[in-house]
Curated annotation (Swiss-Prot):
Bias (Low complexity): 147-214, 898-916, 925-942, 1080-1136
Record's protein name: Putative protein DDB_G0292252
Positions of the UniProt region annotated as Disordered: 1-53, 145-243, 898-951, 1069-1136
Signal peptide boundaries: none
Residue ranges with Polar residues bias: 222-243, 1069-1079
GO molecular-function terms, A-Z: 1-phosphatidylinositol-3-kinase regulator activity
Origin superkingdom: Eukaryota
Biological process terms in GO annotation: G protein-coupled receptor signaling pathway
GO CC terms of this entry: phosphatidylinositol 3-kinase complex; phosphatidylinositol 3-kinase complex, class IB
């Protein structure tokens, strides 16, 4: 027995008479006194539980997690990517590898989701709600556990009376206090009296607590050795606090589970509760108030969903309101929308945590709350029905060691029904979790588990062998196979051979399946000959400095940032400055770029270890790469790559033997280098030794991973011709442009022209349709104004659509590429559905935003001081301030060592002259002295970058980056132009666009967008004012191959709807693996396989038109190509491109859709009055020259115009356009027949895509 028990026994022996009198008084008390005694009895039981058994007390870490989640869900504090990263870094700090802690976080989120689903007005924290939901107890009892004592004044008096032996004074103060003392001294007698006199409702809760007290001794034996009183203000745990946060949280969570299981023995097994139970167990209404009734209703309604009803009146277009009734409580439409948004964010967050972090499925708290969630049966019409079931399935089956779960991930990732474009349009908030499956599989593969990697590829190949596999899913699965070959660290040769045999079956399929299978077969054959070659080729292309010869560089260059980024390919982000969501995506890439960029030495170390794992099956424990100097690592890496490249083209058996022999000899050299470095360190003084050890530990080998790409962000100022006159009109097309945006593109392209080799230029447009149209205008203006800027450049455009804005060009790409739909569009949108809430426009002030960040930072600092051991804290405090001083004090010795190493290496190279040796030594010493300061700063930052918490924003950025790496197909879209004249003929300019032009009700309503956004009810009133246009139309009709046939005039007609759609050609670019061969060999391969699109277009034009004096040179080239297709290559200069050009089977064409309207009623006549034409050009002019009209071009409003012309934009007809600008009446049918549709490759805009879905 403890000291507290002894003191209580003494007080019991001294006050027997008082106890008997008080017991008699208890029997004669009225109902009010009985209620008071009952509450005091419960308080005394809690007090004895705390004093006698040292019961569970909630640790600060668990409380902090609850507070962080509560703030992030309800207060909507997130306003930037940095704040988002701070939240996740704080939440998962030192808890990433703790499965029980992740399970607890998921349990808290599920609790909040159930509260919102049942429309409960919870005024307490998530931890309180979870406790009351699991135990059917009151919140006050939770506060007793939280505080370690009673919460009212009577409990404080009881504690004082138990600690003091002066019972006479306590009897004189108050009779109620004396009765409470008697209850504390005689628990058994008082409990019997209370059972006879008090109500059953109050006794039910008291009996549950007494049962827990009876079993508390068993809990003490399990947790007393590991549990400590751990608060933010305690200072008594200096020697015993030397445990990691995972240990602390483990003890915390185990104690929480034990307290729940012991406190609520009957409530854990929810299956034992009958669904037809008339009255659930009640709790004390005096302690919980009205909130307890809500919990009672929840427990009674969890088994059935009959009380959750959705009542709608009318249709969505009507003005009637929608009522949502849950448990008899009606909600407004705004409250419904807010609740749905929060529930969606909670489910998405749970899905992210369960897929990217290992949790304990057997965690008692999680098992109970999942069981309660499974009892809720949602209707299929509910907002989150599909996501609810999907998250529940993940939580019930998540076990990454189980093959069934890996099969589930591959099945869900390749499921194209969930990522259907129609579903994405109808409900933009569903199925956002599907974009997380592929990163989750990639994370499993990077764990370097041979069994898991083998299981993933076996399941993937099993899908590809299925005879009933749809064609759409085949392309997605092939792309998954290609993607996993890039990221997997180790892959057995047997798996590669089985993949070769399966992919060969798709080689004979038509395009694009056969082309894609050929590319994958090339990758697999290279992997079989030289394991890891695909990864090393991509790494060398993105990081050219990693392949530099060690003879041409010094040790100081390896730590130089300029040398690291030398010749790295750059992704140029064209960001819409006036789009807040575009700026958010820019911040997403900028915030995660510097954090996850390793050094050259680190990449080389990772590569060396991975090659030894693939070939010899040994890791760094048998190598010791961390003991090598950076220059030695570079030398070893260069030798190993030389061996791998030389043995690639030998026979399989011979290459394996030579490769193993050479790698063993290089391993012996590594050991020698390690011995030399250790001997040299032993000869140095103590300060120098500590400095060298800190340098050695910087490049410990890690799992292979491609670093972030190199980015450049260029602000583009979007322009509205309708509201603001442009800075300049580009001649001869009079394209409206912005001078600053155009100047930025000129500077960027000029830098590429200064280089001596051909390049790919990758532009990533971040924005919506307005951004695309603005950049397209500047791009075309430069192509016609300064064509020398595009010489020998392969221009590619990537579309990164903003989260909530409409982007029609992104929808078009999604219709061709399911990977783009799933892993780019949905992945970006998922950022808005993960807590903390991420509104496009923050409603918080900067002061509130900063206070939130500071509060979370303080919590993280507290957990940091709690989590780390005292020894580790002292080491960090000593090393961090001393490390720069040690390096600065030993600059001279470090430089001398570098000079000696370089001289030894340079003497072995007989081909180098003495002058070059001296120059190298001087350059290395000067570089070392100038970069010593920068080196010390990077070492202090790399300590924080060793194991950063992977946030959702970093996962999204990484997933989008693979679009820039692996897109081997290309969607080539011909550019359209709309020439418009106002009422005054001098008001002329040209608007380029890509997809669609329309004149209908959408065009009319677009002019009142501001009014509709402020008051949506004005749509019906505005529709009554719509008046169809009466126009004259002239079209150039063509056949299905795009060959012009004849001109057709349609005079004086009124059309309700006019649409012009750009029809995509039914062929795409041929995919091929990026090779390291010279440009000449790649161009010759192009000639042997395919011809260019320009040549075929020219031939068709010559066969049909027969005239065209302006294109004689092109005709001659085309005739030569007909005779010798294998010898000539007169296409565009895209030699360095990895996207080979294929034969375009048909010329570009447009589809015209006309819907005639009654002139008097202004309505559509019938469905029979819809006319469709395949055309090459169209002219429209208003009959009344005083009336003007507007037009929508790719969703952007332009006008007003009196006359327009729409045709394809070709460089061969610039003179005609220039003449048309001067005189609008000079254009006729003969002018359009000259060189019409004679497009070159540079007249197409190339959009690289991952997989191509053929047009039906």
């Amino acid at each position: 027995m403890s000291d507290d028990n002894n003191s209580n026994n003494m007080s019991n022996n001294n006050n027997n008479n008082n106890n008997n009198n008080n017991n008699n008084n208890n029997n004669n008390n009225n109902n009010n006194n009985n209620n008071n005694n009952n509450s005091n009895n419960n308080n005394s039981n809690n007090n004895n539980e705390n004093n006698n058994n040292k019961s569970f007390q909630i640790q600060p870490i668990l409380i902090q997690i609850s507070e962080i989640l509560q703030q992030s869900i309800e207060l909507k504090l997130c306003s930037s990517v940095n704040t988002h990263n701070v939240f996740w870094d704080t939440l998962l700090y030192n808890l990433e590898l703790n499965g029980d802690a992740i399970s607890m976080i998921i349990s808290l989120l599920l609790t909040k989701y159930i509260l919102l689903l049942n429309n409960e007005n919870n005024q307490y924290s998530l931890l309180q709600a979870l406790f009351t939901k699991l135990t059917n107890a009151s919140v006050e009892e939770f506060n007793d556990l939280l505080n370690g004592n009673n919460s009212n004044n009577n409990s404080n008096n009881n504690n004082n009376n138990n600690n003091n032996n002066n019972n006479n004074n306590n009897n004189n103060n108050n009779n109620n206090n004396n009765n409470n003392n008697n209850n504390n001294n005689n628990n058994n007698n008082n409990n019997n009296n209370n059972n006879n006199n008090n109500n059953n409702n109050n006794n039910s809760n008291g009996n549950n607590i007494n049962t827990s007290n009876g079993n508390e001794d068993d809990v003490e034996q399990q947790t007393e050795s590991t549990e400590q009183d751990f608060t933010s203000t305690s200072q008594n745990s200096t020697p015993s606090i030397s445990r990691l946060a995972s240990k602390l949280s483990q003890t915390d969570l185990d104690s929480f589970n034990l307290s729940i299981s012991e406190t609520n023995l009957t409530g854990v097994n929810y299956s034992s509760v009958s669904p037809q139970q008339s009255s659930p167990p009640l709790i004390s209404t005096s302690s919980t108030g009205s909130l307890s009734n809500d919990y009672i209703n929840i427990n009674n309604n969890n088994n059935s969903n009959s009380n959750i009803n959705i009542n709608t009146s009318g249709t969505n277009d009507s003005d009637s309101t929608t009522t949502f009734s849950i448990n008899g409580i009606n909600m407004s439409s705004e409250e419904i929308k807010e609740s749905e948004t929060i529930r969606l964010s909670i489910l998405s967050t749970i899905g992210y945590l369960s897929l990217f972090h290992k949790f304990n499925p057997q965690f008692p708290t999680l098992k109970v709350i999942i069981h309660k969630l499974g009892e809720i049966q949602l209707e299929k019409s509910r907002f989150e029905y599909s996501l609810h079931n999907e998250v529940l399935r993940i939580l019930q089956t998540n076990n990454q060691d189980n093959n069934d779960f890996l099969f589930f991930l591959i099945d869900q990732c390749s499921d194209q029904n969930s990522s259907n474009l129609d579903n994405l349009k109808l409900n933009n908030n569903i199925n956002k979790i599907n974009s997380w499956y592929n990163p989750s599989i990639r994370k499993i593969l990077r764990e370097e588990s041979v069994s898991k990697s083998k299981a993933v590829f076996e399941h993937l190949l099993l899908f590809l062998k299925h005879p009933l596999l749809s064609e759409k899913r085949v392309l997605f699965l092939l792309q998954m196979l290609k993607h996993y070959l890039l990221v997997i660290p180790v892959l057995s040769s047997l798996t590669i051979q089985s993949a070769l045999s399966i992919v060969k079956t798709y080689y004979l399929w038509p395009k694009p399946y056969g082309c894609f299978a050929k590319e994958i077969l090339e990758i697999l054959s290279l992997e079989l000959k030289s394991p890891g070659s695909y990864f090393r080729n991509i790494l060398a292309r993105e990081f050219p400095s990693i392949m530099s010869s060690p003879n041409s560089i010094g040790s100081a260059s390896l730590t130089n940032t300029l040398f690291t980024n030398k010749n790295r390919p750059t992704i140029h982000f064209l960001v819409d400055k006036y789009n807040s969501e575009a700026l958010l995506i820019q911040e997403l890439f900028e915030a995660n770029y510097n954090t996850y960029t390793p050094s050259i030495t680190q990449l080389q170390s990772n590569n060396i270890e991975n090659i030894y794992k693939r070939i010899l099956g040994i890791d760094n424990s048998q190598l010791g790469i961390e003991f090598l100097e950076p220059i030695d690592v570079s030398t070893i890496h260069f030798k190993i790559l030389d061996v791998m490249n030389k043995t690639m083209y030998l026979e399989e058996n011979e290459s394996k033997s030579i490769r193993i022999k050479e790698l063993i000899s290089i391993r012996d050299e590594i050991i020698k280098f390690c011995n030399l470095s250790t001997n040299s360190n032993s000869n140095l003084n103590s300060t120098t030794t500590t400095a060298t050890t800190t340098n050695i530990l910087k490049h410990v080998p890690k799992n292979i991973e491609l670093p972030n790409l190199n980015y450049q962000f260029i602000s583009m100022l979007t322009l509205s011709v309708r509201h603001k006159r442009p800075d300049q009109f580009g001649t001869p097309f009079y394209i409206p442009i912005n001078r600053k945006s155009t100047t930025s593109l000129i500077d960027l392209l000029s830098n590429y022209q200064d280089q001596d080799f051909h390049n790919q230029v990758k532009f990533a447009i971040i924005g919506n349709d307005t951004s695309v149209q603005h950049i397209l205008a500047s791009y075309l203006f430069l192509k016609y104004q300064q064509p020398e800027l595009f010489h020998s450049l392969d221009i590619m455009f990537y579309i990164i659509p903003t989260g909530t804005s409409n982007c029609k060009i992104a929808e078009l790409i999604s219709s061709f590429d399911p990977w783009y739909t799933n892993q780019v569009r949905q992945c970006l949108v998922s950022l808005y559905s993960i807590i903390p809430s991420f509104p496009p426009i923050s409603k918080l002030s900067k002061i509130e935003r900063q206070s939130f960040i500071e509060s979370i930072s303080q919590i993280k600092d507290l957990r940091n001081s709690i989590a780390l051991k005292e020894n580790e804290l002292e080491q960090q405090q000593q090393q961090q301030p001393q490390q720069p001083q040690q390096q600065n004090s030993d600059v001279a010795s470090i430089i001398l060592n570098e000079q000696q190493q370089q001289q030894q290496q340079q003497q072995s190279n007989l081909n180098n002259s003495n002058n070059e040796i001296k120059n190298d030594i001087n350059s290395s010493t000067t570089a070392a002295t100038t970069t010593t300061t920068t080196t010390t700063t990077t070492t202090t930052t790399t300590i924080h970058k060793d194991n950063p918490v992977e946030t959702p924003s970093h996962t999204i950025q990484t997933e989008i980056e693979y679009l820039f790496r692996e897109a081997s197909f290309s969607l080539e879209i011909p550019v359209l132009k709309c020439e418009g004249w106002g009422i005054d003929d001098n008001n002329y300019f040209t608007i380029p666009f890509l997809m669609k032009a329309e004149m209908n009700t959408s065009t009319f309503l677009a002019g009142f967008s501001d009014l509709i956004s402020s008051d949506p009810t004005q749509i019906n009133k505005l529709m009554g004012k719509y008046s169809p246009m009466n126009v004259n139309i002239k079209i150039l009709q063509c056949n299905q191959m795009g060959v012009p046939l004849q001109w057709i005039n349609i005079d004086n007609k009124t059309f309700y709807d006019i649409e012009i759609n750009n029809i995509m050609p039914k062929s795409i670019s041929h995919p091929t693996i990026q090779s390291t061969s010279s440009p000449s060999t790649s161009s010759s391969n192009n000639n042997n396989s395919t011809t260019t699109a320009t040549n075929n277009n020219g031939n068709n034009g010559n066969n049909n038109n027969g005239n065209g004096n302006n294109n004689n040179n092109n005709n001659n080239n085309n005739n030569n190509n007909n005779n010798n297709n294998n010898n000539n290559n007169n296409g565009p200069a895209t030699i360095s491109s990895s996207l080979k050009k294929s034969i375009i089977q048909s010329k570009p064409k447009m589809q015209l859709v006309l819907i005639e309207a009654e002139q008097k009623k202004k309505k559509v006549k019938s469905s029979e009055d819809t006319f469709k034409f395949t055309i090459n050009a169209i002219e429209m002019e208003s009959i009344d020259k005083k009336k003007s009209f507007d037009i929508l071009l790719d969703g952007q409003l332009h006008g007003p115009f009196n006359k327009i012309k729409i045709s394809f934009c070709s460089s061969n007809i610039s003179n005609i356009i220039n003449n048309a600008a001067k005189n609008s009446s000079s254009s006729n049918s003969s002018n359009y027949s000259i060189g019409f549709n004679d497009l070159q490759d540079n007249d197409f805009i190339t959009f690289p895509i991952m997989s191509f879905l053929p047009l039906v």
